[in-house]
Amino acid sequence: MDGAATKFFRPWESHGSYHHSLPSISPPDSPASTSASSSSSSIGANELTTKRRKCERCTCPNCKAIKHGDRGSQHTHLCSVPGCGKTYKKTSHLRAHLRKHTGDRPFVCDWFDCGKRFDRSDQLIRHKRTHTKEYRFACKFCIRQFSRSDHLQQHLTSVHNIVVVD
């Protein structure tokens, strides 16, 4: 060794920079708005706030880190909606989950007059296959074709009595 300082990658040192603006659900201001929002199936736009999360060794409310200093540390992001309790390893997955609570569906099908909306882009991509008739999975025992592998597996089990093991 030549005595030069070696710089090691320490992901826990830059943990605070990992957090982006996450929407968090805040409770309604008055009891009247609570009764009004309880009849609605989605949370109103006035109840959704965006905050910049300052994280000092994983003290942000949406992140619970396990095993500090370990390269294999896992970050669990907790949904802030009371009574939900769902956790995610990635901030983006938590953000997508929060759309379920807010009813936000930013991904819109642009196929002619369809206009269906989705809260995740992968759902939109899968939906577009219904318009294009794209069948990527074919049954080897009959002529049926499917756009999703899980539908093919369900077909094999129910029609041909074949259990597919992954």
UniProtKB/Swiss-Prot annotation:
<keyword id="KW-0479">Metal-binding</keyword>
<keyword id="KW-0805">Transcription regulation</keyword>
<dbReference type="Pfam" id="PF00096">
    <property type="entry name" value="zf-C2H2"/>
</dbReference>
<feature type="region of interest" description="Disordered">
    <location>
        <begin position="17"/>
        <end position="45"/>
    </location>
</feature>
<keyword id="KW-0863">Zinc-finger</keyword>
<keyword id="KW-0804">Transcription</keyword>
<dbReference type="GO" id="GO:0000978">
    <property type="term" value="F:RNA polymerase II cis-regulatory region sequence-specific DNA binding"/>
</dbReference>
<keyword id="KW-0677">Repeat</keyword>
<feature type="zinc finger region" description="C2H2-type 2">
    <location>
        <begin position="107"/>
        <end position="131"/>
    </location>
</feature>
<dbReference type="GO" id="GO:0008270">
    <property type="term" value="F:zinc ion binding"/>
</dbReference>
<feature type="zinc finger region" description="C2H2-type 3">
    <location>
        <begin position="137"/>
        <end position="160"/>
    </location>
</feature>
<feature type="zinc finger region" description="C2H2-type 1">
    <location>
        <begin position="77"/>
        <end position="101"/>
    </location>
</feature>
<dbReference type="GO" id="GO:0006357">
    <property type="term" value="P:regulation of transcription by RNA polymerase II"/>
</dbReference>
<keyword id="KW-0862">Zinc</keyword>
<feature type="compositionally biased region" description="Low complexity">
    <location>
        <begin position="31"/>
        <end position="42"/>
    </location>
</feature>
<comment type="function">
    <text>Transcription factor. Probably acts downstream of the Wnt signaling pathway.</text>
</comment>
<dbReference type="InterPro" id="IPR013087">
    <property type="entry name" value="Znf_C2H2_type"/>
</dbReference>
<comment type="similarity">
    <text>Belongs to the Sp1 C2H2-type zinc-finger protein family.</text>
</comment>
<dbReference type="InterPro" id="IPR036236">
    <property type="entry name" value="Znf_C2H2_sf"/>
</dbReference>
<dbReference type="GO" id="GO:0000981">
    <property type="term" value="F:DNA-binding transcription factor activity, RNA polymerase II-specific"/>
</dbReference>
<dbReference type="GO" id="GO:0060070">
    <property type="term" value="P:canonical Wnt signaling pathway"/>
</dbReference>
<protein>
    <recommendedName>
        <fullName>Specificity protein transcription factor 2</fullName>
    </recommendedName>
</protein>
